[in-house]
Amino acid sequence: MDGIFLAEHLIKTIDERKKRIIQMLTGGSIKSMEEYRQLVGSLESLDYIGQELRDILEKAD
């Protein structure tokens, strides 16, 4: 498995997870402020990691 394939796969996985989190946040299924904070923190982390991977791929081109 080469690095570009791995990065693209990770970006796809990250984007899918972000969509699920956004659906949970907007769908009203959050039961507590603690769960809300955890999901928002996860979303921020996924955004950061996804952008770092995209930047690496862009520099590789």
Task: Locate each region found by the language model.
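N-terminal acidic leader/helix
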Residues: 1-28
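Short, charge-rich amphipathic interface segments used for partner binding and complex assembly
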Residues: 24-61
